[in-house]
Amino acid sequence: MMPTPVILLKEGTDSSQGIPQLVSNISACQVIAEAVRTTLGPRGMDKLIVDGRGKATISNDGATILKLLDVVHPAAKTLVDIAKSQDAEVGDGTTSVTLLAAEFLKQVKPYVEEGLHPQIIIRAFRTATQLAVNKIKEIAVTVKKQDKVEQRKMLEKCAMTALSSKLISQQKVFFAKMVVDAVMMLDELLQLKMIGIKKVQGGALEESQLVAGVAFKKTFSYAGFEMQPKKYKNPKIALLNVELELKAEKDNAEIRVHTVEDYQAIVDAEWNILYDKLEKIHQSGAKVILSKLPIGDVATQYFADRDMFCAGRVPEEDLKRTMMACGGSIQTSVNALVPDVLGHCQVFEETQIGGERYNFFTGCPKAKTCTIILRGGAEQFMEETERSLHDAIMIVRRAIKNDSVVAGGGAIEMELSKYLRDYSRTIPGKQQLLIGAYAKALEIIPRQLCDNAGFDATNILNKLRARHAQGGMWYGVDINNENIADNFQAFVWEPAMVRINALTAASEAACLIVSVDETIKNPRSTVDPPAPSAGRGRGQARFH
């Protein structure tokens, strides 16, 4: 008698298991790596991505590209996630981390197909990653924080390495200095929010400037604004969340009036309430008034008569940065404008930049904050410049917190590859093969750098292996001369943290994908959305 089949999952559920499914997941990850492979390094290409709404983005940043790709494959999404985590944690190395994870999987694919147990692979990978991280820590060069000149030089070199693969690599010296200046202005916490980046179209890239303080675009202003002064020395600043304009009553207000005098009294009361607020602000001694809500024409003219400057509808993040820079606090009422809640700065002025007017607060006593004003042509170009600067800022922050650096340009990967290959020869069994595969996978970084620059990768990798075997541990790819060079002396430096993070994240992702032995897809997730129903009225649906 046949046993009754047990139906556990809903009809239409797609489940795949075993080795074919694991191989399929590995292949999906390699497809993701193919998407960003050519963007690696100073000779990397850029991608032009157009989203569903027709917005075009040109980018060289691995994390940005993967975010914009609408990836649906569950295993491939893991690689997108590690690129995002690398971007959030370190800022740079997003393409490297994706390539490494895909290459680790590619190297173990033959072993998986032959039926090697995934746990053996995972154990070997964890061992290899631990050895590699310890080796990086051992050979990384520490820069003394006490020596400010030396530290600054190190930070600029790290920023230049991060910028050399971006669109703005021609101006990397200019921007590296700007980024280091910006990060140096911050306090010990090094908060990223304290660096504002504002984009102004027009002008050349070299016209970009760093403002030691807060700067934001002039807000919409009413009549009477022209009469306000545009520059103050040591002004007090009131930060408000109060509406200073006459408006029709909200919430269906109803008033019954019997005489003209009653109506006049109501109108007078409205004016008096507004003038009372304005008088209190004037009495507080504040010279610059910023509000998140609108400041109307009556208030604008009132302030202009008293030599005060006002700006309404200031974006919340700009208001908060001003508060953190100039002190004071954002008030929701004007009844308690005591000196403690007012901020102050050394100079406030409004100046013209390109076609826009900007408000500048400089000499802020409280926090260390700054604003980078970017100039440039096309909008996409400026957005990519902003992303590039974000990467460089993150790198400099990391380098300040962890003051050790390694050589980039594939040098550290080649050294780790040699070290792990030597180590694998000292151990017997399957682990030897797997750690050897891990070591071979590390060579993808210098190989891809050569491929992207159009060099003969095999030839250069042979030279690198020979040089590393002789003890030249900082030798990497020399992009400018199609050769190998001591990248530490060529100042291609990266914070050791970037490499440690990339290796651990890539290894974890590879282990995660190898450890999946079954994929179950619920039918509901693959059903097409229902077609829109026929419209009513004139535009009736037609059926052919």
Curated annotation (Swiss-Prot):
Cross-link (Glycyl lysine isopeptide (Lys-Gly) (interchain with G-Cter in SUMO2)): K430
Residue positions, PTM N-acetylmethionine: M1
Modified residues (Omega-N-methylarginine): R536
Class of the enzyme per the UniProt entry, highest EC level: hydrolase
Pfam families linked: Cpn60_TCP1
In-chain residues carrying the UniProt-annotated modification N6-acetyllysine: K67, K250, K320
Top-level taxonomic group: Eukaryota
UniProt region (Disordered), positions on chain: 523-544
The keyword Metal-binding is assigned to this record: yes
Reported modifications of this chain: The N-terminus is blocked.
GO molecular function: ATP binding; ATP hydrolysis activity; ATP-dependent protein folding chaperone; identical protein binding; unfolded protein binding
Location(s) in or outside the cell: Cytoplasm
Keyword Magnesium: yes
Entries under CDD domains matching the protein: TCP1_eta
Keyword list, A-Z: Acetylation, ATP-binding, Chaperone, Cytoplasm, Hydrolase, Isopeptide bond, Magnesium, Metal-binding, Methylation, Nucleotide-binding, Ubl conjugation
InterPro entries for the chain: Chap_CCT_eta (IPR012720), Chaperone_TCP-1 (IPR017998), Chaperonin_TCP-1_CS (IPR002194), Cpn60/GroEL/TCP-1 (IPR002423), GroEL-like_apical_dom_sf (IPR027409), GROEL-like_equatorial_sf (IPR027413), TCP-1-like_intermed_sf (IPR027410), TCP-1_chaperonin (IPR053374)
Subunit structure of this chain's protein: Component of the chaperonin-containing T-complex (TRiC), a hexadecamer composed of two identical back-to-back stacked rings enclosing a protein folding chamber. Each ring is made up of eight different subunits: TCP1/CCT1, CCT2, CCT3, CCT4, CCT5, CCT6A/CCT6, CCT7, CCT8. Interacts with PACRG. Interacts with DLEC1.
Protein name per its UniProtKB record: T-complex protein 1 subunit eta
Source organism: Mus musculus (Mouse)
Lineage summary: Eukaryota, Metazoa, Chordata, Craniata, Vertebrata
